[in-house]
Structure formats: structure tokens, C-alpha cells
Amino acid sequence: MLYSKGKATTTYSIHVKQSEFAKQLGISRQALNVHLRKLRLNSYVRTGRGFIDVTEKGLALLGVSVNPAFVFIKVSPLRRSEAYQRLIELPIQRVFRVAGDMDAVLFVERERLDDALRKLAAIDGIQETKSYVTIETLK
């Protein structure tokens, strides 16, 4: 029931204890809690035991688009294993291996598309790429 009533959203999660995160920021856990409470009240983050999620509203505030770019990749059959390993190491949201005319699909933040394409150009075995930037999310 929860799944059928739910809505797909984009969030970024950090899995860290708040005490550890506060230490990394150089503030007390209590000070972090005050800041997080304000962010929660404005729906910018969700928090729980051991995690902080940045919501779509929070991402928009940070200037991160929730409408991604997709990069379709054709890989040389002789280089697939090493090319796939290099794709996994890229700082992108998701990598999918697919069947059909192309071999992989990357799910990339629009703001990181240029960087991703530069890094793809340096991977041996990448024969072709096609990039598509989404305009809006319809559903």
C-alpha cells in the first residue's frame, strides 16, 4: 500500500551519525540539531537515526536540477569489462547496463554533464555517446 500510494522523488542521502557530522563541521551536535531543525521545518532535509536526506526542495535551493541528463554509450565488445568498471567509478548518479543498440545508460545531474562527457572521452573502449537533457519531469 505504501508503495502504490508513494511518489518517486530525488533525494541525496548522507549516511552519518549527527555527532560525527557535527565534528566534521566543527560545531557541536546541539548546534547541528538547531540548524537541521530549521531545514526540516522548511522541507529542505529529512533526518533520522544515522542519515540526512536533502529533498528536491533542498536540491533546488542548492541550484541542483532534479531533471537529469541521460547519456547512452556504445562500448567495444573487447573492452566492456574494463569500460564498465571505469563507468562505475565516475561521479554520476547511476549506471545501467542495457540490451539493444547501446550498451550502457548513465543517469547524470545536468550540472555535471560536461564533466561526465570529458571523463567518458578518456575511457578506452567507448565508441559512441548520445546525450539527452530532460526539460521537465512529467510524472
Label the model's feature ranges.
Residues M1-K139:
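A compositional/biophysical signature of low hydrophobicity enriched in polar/charged and small residues
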